[in-house]
Swiss-Prot record:
GO biological process: DNA recombination; DNA repair
Region (Flexible linker): 141-145
Pfam families referenced in this protein's UniProt entry, alphabetically: HHH_5, RuvA_C, RuvA_N
Region (Domain II): 63-141
Region described as Domain III: 146-195
Name of the protein described by the UniProt record: Holliday junction branch migration complex subunit RuvA
Species this chain originates from: Exiguobacterium sp. (strain ATCC BAA-1283 / AT1b)
GO molecular function, one term: four-way junction DNA binding
Places the protein is found: Cytoplasm
């Protein structure tokens, strides 16, 4: 099994990166390939070697924690490697764990390729099994029931305003403990972004 691949980024496209490891180019499918575009130095990508009878694919992650989440998602019926990669790419790990633990289908169905049936299956298969990914996890009782949909709407508004996923993730983390209206979330987020 390949634990990680280390080397300079030789090529970046929308689906994968190519790492030059001692003159051999490794094609690695990663959650957010353009994250690597800015890095000229050697990078370490923690990998999952996916083998099927007709293909072998390397999936790569910035941390072991991301890779472990990917592996856990693969164990869910109805989620394949592309779906698991999309979930890792588009979600905050702590918020995802909280949604699974609280069985928040509304949050889980926002991920690409996840419908109500798959969201229920995720909660059923993974609830209580993600503690090693979040050792300090404390359930946010009521967070998703009260305020989360407003925060989601505010984040969607920030996307429409042209803010990057990275900027929105930082703001979301800062605002996740507050319970506000959508308008108040947007105002507060803009204040944080313009500092």
């Amino acid at each position: 099994m390949i634990e990680f691949v280390k080397g300079p980024v030789a090529y970046v496209c929308a689906e994968y990166i190519t790492l030059d490891v001692s003159g051999v180019g490794y094609k690695v499918h990663v959650p957010n390939p353009f994250f690597y575009r800015e890095q000229d130095e050697h990078v370490i990508v923690f990998t999952h070697h996916y083998v099927r009878e007709d293909q072998q694919t390397l999936y790569g992650f910035r941390s072991r924690r991301e890779r472990e989440l990917f592996n856990k998602l693969l164990s869910v019926s109805g989620i394949g490697p592309k779906g698991a990669l999309a979930i890792v790419a588009s979600g905050d790990i702590d918020a995802l764990i909280d949604a699974i633990e609280t069985e928040n289908e509304k949050y889980l169905t926002k991920f690409p390729g996840v419908g109500k049936k798959t969201a229920k299956q995720m909660a059923l298969d993974l609830k209580g099994k993600l503690s090693e990914l979040a050792p300090d996890y404390v359930p946010n009782e009521g967070l998703f029931a009260q305020g989360a949909s407003e925060l989601d709407e505010a984040c969607e508004a920030l996307v429409a305003l042209g803010y990057s996923e990275r900027e929105i993730a930082k703001v979301r983390k800062a605002l996740s403990g507050e319970i506000l209206t959508t308008d108040a979330y947007i105002k507060r987020a803009l204040q944080l972004l313009l500092k």
